[in-house]
Swiss-Prot record:
The record marks 112 as: Interaction with substrate tRNA. GO terms for molecular function: ATP binding; tRNA dimethylallyltransferase activity. This is tRNA dimethylallyltransferase. It catalyses: adenosine(37) in tRNA + dimethylallyl diphosphate = N(6)-dimethylallyladenosine(37) in tRNA + diphosphate. ATP binds at residues 21-28. Its EC number is 2.5.1.75. The gene is miaA. It comes from Wigglesworthia glossinidia brevipalpis.
Length: 322
């Protein structure tokens, strides 16, 4: 296929806009500003915002009842539910199709990079989550211990085992679950991908290049969360929703540390230090991902209104919008 035919094929595909970036850089605000200018509906790409009642610690948008202000994939699960990247991909694809059929453009915004990657490049055909199998596996792991479980994984799939830490109990459990459910090792299954995303996409990365400025934003944001009642939010989840540290929702930064504090595992000062440190590490990890990302426009954010204008102008220049 020559270049012109390839371009024509892409231009005939339904459109989508991706806004990703480091944590605390103003992605959501930029998306909200763009929504006032563009024929879009917003889809959240955030592994924390899917959970009901987890509002302050995820810096969740203030979702109004009006359908015109609707965010998709926000408040769709209880904190004790299991929601995987596979679930996200299926849900996001269905919503993107519905938005496109309305003649609108899906605008996906968030910082969960693996979610974005799953949309763009597909996922391996892994066995679906099964609570009964998981409980049986947990029972077996409790009998033999985490170390022996890791040694077993290393024996059956040394490649996958070499890419995870022995103390990464979540990924270790998932790897063993895949093996016992399918009879195949994770490394082999990860080679087979589902279909890639057939959309004409414009991707934007919102970045803050000055680490001191970014880390100050992260620190200030967390202290605002504490001021706005984050402790009470997690207390409610702990007491009323019976959440515990082993649930996927409690892997979210801030919730994990606050729950540890409320359970008496760490003190208040440690909770603050550990949360800010973990968020800084996340921002660094996101930056590493994004620097390697293909076909992306980097927007260095000093002001959300200026950044949204930059994005709008790029879309206009590319004839992506009328």
């Amino acid at each position: 296929m020559n270049e012109n035919k390839c371009t024509d094929k892409i231009n005939n595909l339904p459109k989508a806009i991706f806004i990703m970036g480091q944590t605390a850089v103003g992605k959501t605000k930029i998306a909200e500003i763009l929504k006032k200018k563009l024929p879009v509906e917003i889809i959240s790409v955030d592994s924390g915002c899917i959970y009901k009642g987890m509002n302050i610690g995820t810096d969740k948008p203030n979702v109004k009842k009006s359908s015109s202000d609707k965010y998709h994939l926000i408040d769709i699960c209880e904190p004790n539910d299991y929601y995987s990247v596979e679930n996200f991909r299926l849900d996001a694809l269905k919503i993107m199709e519905k938005i496109s059929k309305k003649g609108l453009i899906p605008l996906l915004v968030g910082g969960s990079m693996f979610y974005f990657k799953s949309l763009l490049h597909g996922l391996s055909n892994l066995p679906s989550y099964n609570i009964e199998n998981k409980n049986l596996l947990k029972k077996k792991i409790n009998e033999i211990g985490w170390y022996k479980s890791y040694i077993f994984l290393k024996k059956i799939d040394p490649i996958f085992a070499s890419n995870i830490h022995p103390n990464d109990h979540y990924r270790l459990t998932r790897a063993l679950e895949i093996y016992f459910s399918s009879g195949n090792i994770p490394t082999n299954l990860f080679k087979a991908k589902t279909k890639k995303l057939e959309y004409n996409i414009r991707q934007f990365s919102i970045m803050i290049s000055d680490k001191k400025i970014l880390y100050k934003k992260i620190k200030d944001r967390f202290f605002n969360m504490l001021k706005n009642g984050f402790k009470k939010e997690v207390e409610f989840l702990k007491n009323k929703k019976q959440i515990n540290k082993n649930m996927p929702s409690m892997r979210c930064i801030g919730y994990k540390q606050m729950l540890a504090y409320l359970s008496g595992e760490i003190n208040y000062k440690e909770m603050i230090l550990f949360t800010i440190s973990a968020t800084n590490k996340l921002a660094k990890k996101q930056s590493t991902w994004l620097k390697k990302w293909k076909n992306i426009n980097y927007i260095y954010n000093k002001d959300v209104y200026i950044s949204s204008e930059e994005i709008f102008n790029i879309l206009k220049k590319d004839n992506f919008i009328d």
